[in-house]
Curated annotation (Swiss-Prot):
GO terms for biological process: L-histidine biosynthetic process. This is ATP phosphoribosyltransferase. Its cofactor is Mg(2+). It is an enzyme of class 2 (transferase). Keywords: Amino-acid biosynthesis, ATP-binding, Cytoplasm, Glycosyltransferase, Histidine biosynthesis, Magnesium, Metal-binding, Nucleotide-binding, Transferase. It is found in: Cytoplasm. Belongs to the ATP phosphoribosyltransferase family. Long subfamily. Catalyzes the condensation of ATP and 5-phosphoribose 1-diphosphate to form N'-(5'-phosphoribosyl)-ATP (PR-ATP). Has a crucial role in the pathway because the rate of histidine biosynthesis seems to be controlled primarily by regulation of HisG enzymatic activity. InterPro entries: ATP-PRT_HisG_long, ATP_PRibTrfase_cat, ATP_PRibTrfase_HisG, HisG_C, N-reg_PII-like_a/b, N-reg_PII/ATP_PRibTrfase_C. NCBIfam families: hisG, HisG_C-term. The keyword Metal-binding applies.
Length: 292
């Protein structure tokens, strides 16, 4: 693709490390220095920019970036008109979505969202919260929070809407969740103009395939072994696989090689059982990508 160059915005901050690990698994090497906002990547058709995820969707819509990875939450918060290439189910420390939650101090009299009528709410996602309140018919004062939102309750505001992945920060600050207003995964996005270009669309579709295949391989491993033919049927009955295990005859005609893909968590119990059933040369190996 001679001459193709796409400016891609990757999230700076809490999602940065997980995103770099995902790109590495997908086959890309992104070289960063401590203060670099334009890291190098081993793909001549890409130029990487590290940008706050809150801003990526807006910059893609306006054409300053061609594509990027940012949360569904920030696309909605910015009301950005962008093309979603695919959803990427990963986050900072888990494979679960982050949640925007309405929370109050554990001793607050507020038990349900309607109890916040006329109260003050602090959040970084002002538009999301206003849309939520409008939907449930509650009028409250919503103010923008520049950070450390959890510590503002109850002295400065009555409630907050903040992002959480595990809930540990909320518990540490003695907060209680009243409602969840949104769940969000990162989205791989581009502008409508970029998606309309066939060459760029092919490039982005290939990237999406590689990124999703890297996510598919999470927590899965390959397992291969040699099995006596007479034990094959019994072993296949207990052996998980994506579809069916691969079975190949060995040169002596008495043994077969068996290979399969399975959840890593199952190997601990399965490997000793396979050994007892006559399998030999059992090898577990890691995976970078699974393309369905």
């Amino acid at each position: 693709m001679s001459g193709l160059k796409l400016r891609i915005g990757l999230p700076k901050g809490s999602l940065e490390e997980a995103t770099m690990e995902l790109f590495e698994k997908a086959g890309y090497i992104v070289a960063r220095s401590n203060r670099a906002y334009r890291p190098a990547i081993d793909d001549n058709e890409l130029e990487v920019r590290l940008v706050r995820p809150q801003e990526i969707a807006r910059y893609v819509e306006q054409g300053f970036l061609d594509c990027g990875i940012t949360g569904k939450d920030w696309i909605l918060e910015n009301n950005a008109d962008v093309h979603i290439i695919c959803e990427l189910k990963y986050n900072k420390s888990t494979s679960s979505p982050v949640k925007w939650v309405l929370a109050v101090h554990e001793n607050s009299p507020v038990r349900k969202p309607s109890d916040l009528q006329g109260k003050w709410i602090a959040t970084e996602a002002v538009n999301l919260v206003k849309q939520y309140l409008n939907k449930i018919g509650v009028e409250a004062h919503v103010e923008f929070s520049w950070g450390a939102t959890e510590v503002k309750v109850p002295e400065l505001v009555d409630a907050i809407v903040d992002i959480t992945e595990t809930g540990s920060s909320l518990r540490a600050n003695h907060l209680r969740i009243v409602d969840t207003i949104l769940e969000s995964f990162p989205q791989f996005i581009c502008s409508h103009k970029v998606w309309a270009d066939q060459e760029k669309r092919r490039k982005l579709s290939s990237m999406a395939l590689l990124l999703q295949s890297a996510l598919n391989a999470r927590n899965k491993v390959g397992l291969k072994m040699n099995v006596p033919k007479e034990n094959l049927s019994a072993i296949l009955k207990i052996l998980p696989s994506l579809r069916n295990p691969t079975v190949s005859p060995l040169a002596d005609g008495q043994w077969v090689a068996v290979e399969t893909i399975l959840d890593e968590s199952k190997v601990r119990d399965l490997a000793p059982q396979l050994k007892e059933m006559g399998a030999e040369g059992i090898i577990e190996y890691s995976l970078n990508k699974i393309i369905y």
